[in-house]
Amino acid sequence: KCAFVLVKTSNPSSVELQDMVAGDRLVYKVMGDLTERLARDTAGKYGYNVLGVVVGATHPNELKDLRRRLEKSFFLVPGYGAQGGTAADVQYAFDRYGHGAIVNASRSIMWAWKKTGKDGLDYQEAARAAAEQMRDEICAYVTIV
């Protein structure tokens, strides 16, 4: 079992809180470090701690920084697709083996049928195609060992 801590979310307004300075550090870095400290020595069979972090695909620099700092944390990465996150952005969420992250896309998959010009009755085919395209795009940047 695992819980996820909101560290740097994908929404544009995340800067209002998560980029504030707390002491001499940004709040999102404080939250990342706190998550690491609280989860220390909880790594399971595959090496990840029981506390994961939520870091948005729309913040690739923060993803890169936090992945370096939180090697044993699992990353939940919202914001792919409709919010603007790309495969090039999310590559930084994965560890050196191509593991340790779940990339989430909702609207870009659920509403993929709108791009087909059809009535949406076959929405599942459009959703499947969008999910497969997402997978292929990410695999172009992430090597899984």
What positions do the PLM features span?
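Generic structural signal for well-ordered alpha-helices
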Residues: 32, 36, 63, 87, ...
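Conserved anion-binding
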Residues: 1-51
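C-terminal helical cap(s) of enzyme catalytic domains, especially alpha/beta-barrels
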Residues: 90-96, 111-145
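Short, low-complexity, polar/charged sequence segments that are solvent-exposed and flexible
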Residues: 1, 22-27, 72-75, 94-97, ...
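Short, acidic Gly/Pro/Ser/Thr-rich loop/turn segments
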Residues: 10-13, 60, 110-112, 117
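A C-terminal functional module that forms or caps the active site or interfaces directly
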Residues: 53, 57-104, 108-112
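Electropositive phosphate-/nucleotide-binding environments in soluble metabolic enzymes
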Residues: 25, 29, 60, 84, ...
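Surface-exposed amphipathic alpha-helices with a cationic face
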Residues: 36-40, 66-70, 135, 139
